[in-house]
């Protein structure tokens, strides 16, 4: 991009004058390159604010910047005063006077609403220096813009923002270095984890990874526990620290829906993920089921396509977010879906913060802690970046508690366990034909679940993990048999 402070040559100004609206637009671009952009996806003007780009609401500054073009024309008109006075040849003098008159007419036109809007309209048809698309923004996963620069997440160093980097989402706090302290925050995390330092360190690595724009871990952390356990405090504090880089999403985006929304219409929920580093889904009602297809889509690395209601075009972008689910109720997840269990990790929040602690898993609540933590914003930002640096060397490195909790969760979701308990008998002397077992399972499922029956292939995969399946003309399961009637009949 051209340096907007560079003096514009007179010949260039005169050429722009001769090209009418297209010339006005060309001169506008020369004066505003590096200061303004036109997002042609949304039709919005953007402004450079030191280290990142922001939306120019109502295009007010883009419109006001037309005065820079007016100023160039006015300076040229003033230069012509001496040239007209010095001109001896009448024809030359008349030509200069006509050019000056045209400059003043152009100035008057550009100071009208119609003239300004026309010039901005033509700007979109000129060179590409001021034209971008929505998917051009926020593509560097290792850059974290903040109030006083851009943090390099690979090193923890700060550099000045560059308009060419097209960074838009930013953290609204200053970077004060890796050593900025956050003692109350670190104690709060440790308290939430019941003094388990291994878990507190894991939370640090997890969020450290999450502030990158990478999706290499393909992970869905589920923060689970009964109410008043610090989940909301943790999330709201991170939202305060990270600003628009962390945001909530509707939990319905992750759940099975009775009616599917048309994919051809606007989908602002997906569009809201553009450029985020951390996305939080809050609370799921008891008995709800995760949508495996949605979870895989929203926690994967494949590009997403979305459009806001008033956008002119769809935007295709690669995800930059880590998605978290915060819930008091564990949603149902198919135990046989190996892909989703590779993503899902259950992180228990087992401590409750209450006014009058009476039980071993209760602690005294500090109702002012949320406001106190805001004072540690710079330190919490440093804590996040330190976690990112540790993650780069150690990976997420799941603690034993996380692996055990996730395994227990998966066992709870084993849809065949109740069927085997109610309809089968186990012993090495028993065997059952696979087709008979599936027929019995289908009847049991329809009576008890009322939803679509898992396919025979899926059922077979799960049962084959538990019982020896052999083929003798047809498949048999060895080690279990069918009861003549269910136990509760």
Locate each region found by the language model.
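Active-site-surrounding "flap" and adjacent substrate/cofactor-binding loops of secreted or lumenal enzymes
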Residues: 63-77
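Trp- and S/T/G-rich repeat-edge/linker motifs of beta-rich repeat architectures
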Residues: 47, 52-66
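Feature primarily recognizes SF3-like P-loop helicase cores of small DNA viruses
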Residues: 2-43, 74, 78-489
């Amino acid at each position: 991009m051209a340096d907007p402070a560079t003096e514009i040559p007179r010949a260039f100004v005169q050429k722009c004058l001769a090209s009418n609206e297209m010339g006005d637009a060309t001169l506008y671009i020369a004066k505003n390159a590096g200061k303004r952009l036109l997002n042609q996806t949304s039709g919005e003007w953007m402004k450079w604010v030191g280290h990142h780009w922001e939306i120019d609401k109502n295009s007010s500054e883009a419109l006001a910047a037309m005065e820079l073009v007016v100023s160039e024309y006015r300076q040229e008109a003033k230069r012509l005063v001496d040239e007209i006075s010095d001109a001896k040849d009448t024809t030359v003098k008349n030509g200069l006077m006509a050019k000056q008159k045209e400059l003043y007419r152009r100035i008057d036109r550009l100071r009208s609403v119609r003239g300004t809007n026309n010039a901005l309209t033509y700007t979109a048809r000129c060179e590409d220096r001021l034209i971008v698309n929505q998917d051009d923004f926020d593509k560097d996963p290792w850059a974290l813009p903040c109030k006083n620069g851009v943090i390099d997440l690979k090193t923890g160093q700060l550099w000045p923002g560059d308009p060419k980097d097209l960074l838009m989402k930013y953290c609204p706090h200053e970077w004060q270095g890796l050593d900025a302290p956050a003692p109350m925050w670190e104690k709060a995390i440790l308290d939430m984890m019941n003094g388990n330092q291994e878990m507190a360190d894991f939370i640090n690595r997890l969020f450290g990874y999450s502030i990158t724009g990478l999706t290499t871990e393909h992970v869905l952390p589920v923060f689970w526990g009964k109410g008043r356990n610090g989940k909301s405090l943790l999330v709201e504090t991170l939202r305060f620290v990270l600003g628009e880089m962390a945001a909530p999403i509707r939990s319905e985006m992750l759940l099975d829906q009775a009616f599917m929304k048309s994919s051809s219409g606007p989908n602002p929920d997906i569009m809201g993920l553009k450029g985020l580093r951390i996305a939080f889904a809050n609370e799921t009602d008891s008995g709800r089921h995760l949508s495996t297809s949605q979870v895989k889509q929203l926690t994967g690395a494949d590009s997403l396509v979305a459009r806001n209601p008033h956008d002119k075009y769809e935007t295709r972008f690669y995800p930059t977010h880590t998605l978290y689910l915060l819930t008091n109720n564990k949603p149902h997840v198919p135990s046989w879906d190996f892909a989703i269990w590779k993503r899902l990790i259950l992180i228990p929040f087992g401590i409750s913060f209450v006014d009058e602690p009476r039980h071993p898993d209760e602690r005294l609540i500090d109702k002012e802690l949320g406001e106190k933590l805001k004072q540690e914003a710079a330190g919490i930002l440093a804590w996040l970046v330190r976690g990112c640096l540790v993650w780069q060397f150690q990976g997420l490195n799941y603690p034993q508690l996380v692996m055990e909790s996730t395994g227990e969760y998966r066992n709870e979701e084993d849809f065949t366990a109740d069927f085997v308990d109610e309809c089968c008998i186990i012993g090495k002397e028993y065997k059952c034909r696979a087709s008979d077992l599936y027929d019995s399972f289908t009847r049991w499922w329809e009576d008890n679940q009322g939803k679509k029956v898992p396919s025979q292939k899926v059922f077979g995969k799960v049962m084959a993990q538990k019982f020896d399946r052999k083929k003798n003309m047809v498949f048999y399961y060895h080690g279990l048999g069918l009861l003549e009637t269910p136990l509760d009949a």
